[in-house]
């Protein structure tokens, strides 16, 4: 009789059911804007956030000498997206010192290490590759890495470890305000559907979602190319120009087309971008049944009182 072989079933973060978690954030110097250390209390992965101005303090710690993966976070790109560079090193402190001399854009580093110092170079290489791939897929940040390179050869048991490490790191990064791996759009409902809203008229034919962060206009949505006269000289006109300059909206004939999913701070800003005029997004965005976003979301809150 053949011996049964164990199966390595690798689940990505988006495949895991959301569940309550306890996260601890430690402030070594008592400064909430200084170095911060985040952990999920039942796991061995730690994320240390280091302001560039406090890099010298981090270098003095034993954690800086460990194998780890790091994220350099910085100023906005031309497309209006925050920048990130993802790397790994057998000694993260030494590598950050090098990056301090060679890269200008970043102002904070987030370092992923093991509490038990059990992360190996093999782990780090796979984690770097997977993190870059996942960040590109999410599309939230402008990735400063050039080429992701080939998938590194990693034994199946170590790869399983890496997926668990990545899941933990993704949660901790988001907790520290850097949701590098989270998609803009909402997950499907239990019925496998998404709650979509539509903006039509005034040259617009857009699709989007209302999320916890704002309003996401989907890739492929079409909008009006020219602004109406009342928008000229206003901040909204410059806002639309930046979207075009950054390649978020691409001119195509007499229209603009969204080249990617894009998060707006409010439904109204999303409607302005599509229609080229002042607009109340709560009224312009409508569900498939014709109900406005206001009726579906804001009025629902009132009825819950």
Regions found by a protein language model. Give the residues of each.
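Hydrophobic side chains in beta-strands
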Residues: 72, 89, 111-113, 219, ...
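Hydrophobic/aromatic-lined pockets within catalytic cores
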Residues: 101, 132, 136-140, 177, ...
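Internal, well-ordered alpha/beta segment that forms a basic, Gly-enriched binding/recognition surface
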Residues: 107-167
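C-terminal engagement modules used by replication, chromatin/transcription, nuclear envelope/ESCRT
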Residues: 287-305
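A short, sequence-level motif marking secondary-structure junctions
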Residues: 88-92, 211-214, 300-301
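Polyanion-binding interface signature
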Residues: 189-284
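GIY-YIG nuclease catalytic motif and its immediate N-terminal context
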Residues: 2-101, 118-126, 130, 168-195, ...
């Amino acid at each position: 009789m053949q011996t049964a072989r164990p199966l390595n079933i690798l689940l990505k973060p988006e495949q895991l059911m959301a569940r309550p978690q306890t996260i601890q954030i430690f402030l070594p110097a008592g400064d909430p804007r200084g170095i911060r250390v985040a952990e999920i209390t039942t796991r061995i992965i730690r994320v240390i956030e280091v302001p560039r101005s406090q890099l010298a303090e981090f270098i003095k710690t034993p954690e800086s000498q460990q194998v780890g993966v790091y994220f350099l976070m910085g100023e906005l790109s031309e497309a209006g997206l925050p920048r990130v560079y993802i790397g790994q090193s057998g000694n993260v402190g030494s590598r950050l010192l090098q990056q301090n001399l060679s890269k200008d854009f970043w102002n904070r580093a987030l370092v992923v290490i093991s509490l038990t110092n059990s992360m190996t170079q093999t782990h780090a290489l796979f984690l770097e590759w997977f993190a870059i791939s996942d960040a590109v897929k999410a599309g939230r940040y402008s990735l400063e890495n050039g080429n992701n390179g080939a998938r590194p050869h990693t034994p199946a048991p170590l790869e399983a470890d890496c997926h668990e490490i990545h899941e933990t790191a993704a949660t901790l990064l988001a907790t520290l305000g850097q949701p590098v791996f989270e998609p803009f759009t909402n997950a499907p409902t239990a019925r496998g559907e998404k709650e979509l809203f539509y903006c039509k008229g005034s040259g617009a034919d857009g699709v989007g979602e209302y999320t916890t962060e704002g309003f996401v206009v989907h890739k492929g949505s079409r909008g009006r190319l020219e602004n109406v006269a009342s928008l000229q000289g206003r901040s909204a006109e410059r806002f639309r120009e930046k979207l075009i300059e950054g390649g978020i909206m691409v001119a195509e004939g007499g229209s603009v087309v969204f080249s990617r999913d894009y998060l707006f701070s409010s439904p109204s800003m999303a409607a302005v971008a599509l229609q080229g005029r002042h607009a109340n997004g709560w009224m312009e965005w409508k569900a498939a049944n014709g109900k406005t976003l206001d009726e579906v979301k804001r009025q629902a809150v009132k009825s819950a009182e």
